[in-house]
Amino acid sequence: MVQHQLRARGIGDERVLAALGRLPREQFMPLDSRRLAYEDCALPIAEGQTISQPYMVALMSEALRLTGHERVLEIGTGSGYAAAVLGRLAASVISIERHPALAEQAAALLQSLGFANVTVRIGDGTRGWPSAAPYDAIVVTAGAPAVPASLTGQLAPGGRLVIPVGVAKQQMLMRITNQNGRLLREEITPCVFVPLIGAHGWRTPE
C-alpha cells in the first residue's frame, strides 16, 4: 500500500508513510469488508459514515506538516483510523465525533491499540473543542459549506487547518494557516467527503 498507493502518488513525508504502513487498517473496518482493507478507496462503516481512503488520510496528514510536538484537533472520528495515524504523528490528539456509538467504538479500539495520546469526545465538531484550544493543527474529515470561523479561531499562531469545503460531491481540500491573525488559504486538491453536520456546517445531510 505504501509504495503503490501513497509514495507513487506523491506522498513524500516519511513519518506519514511509516505511520500508515504500521497501522492495521482492517481493525478499523466492519468484518464483512475487511478483505478490502488495503484497497485505496473510502468504505462504509456504521451511521452512514465512511473510513477514508488511505491516500486521502496520508494527503491530509502530510498537509498538516506535523513534526511530533503538536496538539491536534480532529473533527469526525468515524472509525478512529485517521485519529490513530495522527496519534503516531503528533504529541496529542483530541478527536470529536457526533455519533455516540461510533465515538465509543473508536475510543475502545484506540485504547486497545495503545494510543494513550488520543482522546475521543462526543459533540458538535463544527464548534471545535474550545476548552483545550489553541491547537497547532486541526483536520476536518467531512465536507463543510464554508470554513467555520469557530475552527480558525482555535488555531494557535502558525497553526494549520485542513478541511474539505464545497457542496455535496464537489469539494476542495483547503489548508488555512494562521499567520499572526491573518488567514492564508491554499487549495490542495478536489475531493468528496460526507457532509459536516453541525451548527457551523450543514444542518442536515445533503
Would you name each region that the model predicts?
Residues 1-77, 81-84, 89, 102-119, ...:
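Class I SAM-dependent transferase core
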Residues 65-184:
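Conserved nucleotide-cofactor-binding alpha/beta core module
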